[in-house]
């Protein structure tokens, strides 16, 4: 009898656990004053678990570069703390990447809203012109 396929791979579960632990560590354990309000948005782990890309955002965009420096300099400490919290043969090297998906999403939303406004103005004027034209034809 074949085993039922699980919904998530082991690397997905490891990435999720790393994300949870890093969120807690950056909130409580990261004492670097350069680090702003950090949100860990996603973690991707390589198949061999040797590297992990950690995606993050910050509340204040002006602290973005300083936060990147703080995370890069704290990577060893965070990896060590992860090793204490998560029992793995080898903890992956952490690579921090700023997640600009929220900014891209807001930009796309503003573009969609702009086009919708332009269409409403364009078609609203055309519809008003048609209504006036119908009244004159009688």
Swiss-Prot record:
Organism: Chromobacterium violaceum (strain ATCC 12472 / DSM 30191 / JCM 1249 / CCUG 213 / NBRC 12614 / NCIMB 9131 / NCTC 9757 / MK)
GO CC field: cytosol
Record protein name field: Ribosome-binding factor A
Keywords from the UniProt entry: Cytoplasm, Ribosome biogenesis
GO molecular function: ribosomal small subunit binding
Biological role stated in the UniProt entry: One of several proteins that assist in the late maturation steps of the functional core of the 30S ribosomal subunit. Associates with free 30S ribosomal subunits (but not with 30S subunits that are part of 70S ribosomes or polysomes). Required for efficient processing of 16S rRNA. May interact with the 5'-terminal helix region of 16S rRNA.
Transmembrane segments: none
Oligomer and partners: Monomer. Binds 30S ribosomal subunits, but not 50S ribosomal subunits or 70S ribosomes.
Record SUPFAM superfamilies: Ribosome-binding factor A, RbfA
Pfam families to which the protein is assigned, alphabetical: RBFA
Cytoplasm is among the record's keywords: yes
Annotated S-S bridges: none
Assigned protein family: Belongs to the RbfA family.
One of the protein's GO biological processes: maturation of SSU-rRNA
Annotated compartments: Cytoplasm
């Amino acid at each position: 009898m074949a085993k039922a396929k699980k919904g998530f791979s082991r690397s997905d579960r490891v990435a999720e656990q790393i994300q949870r632990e890093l969120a807690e560590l950056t909130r409580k354990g990261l004492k670097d004053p350069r680090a702003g309000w950090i949100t860990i948005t996603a973690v991707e782990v390589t198949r061999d678990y040797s590297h992990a890309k950690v995606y993050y955002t910050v509340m204040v965009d002006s602290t973005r570069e300083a936060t990147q420096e703080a995370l890069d300099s704290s990577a060893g400490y965070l990896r060590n703390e992860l090793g204490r919290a998560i029992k793995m043969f080898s903890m992956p090297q952490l690579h921090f990447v700023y997640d600009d998906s929220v900014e891209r999403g807001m930009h796309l939303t503003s573009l969609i809203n702009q086009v919708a406004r332009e269409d409403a103005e364009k078609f609203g004027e055309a519809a008003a012109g048609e209504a006036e034209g119908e009244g004159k034809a009688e």
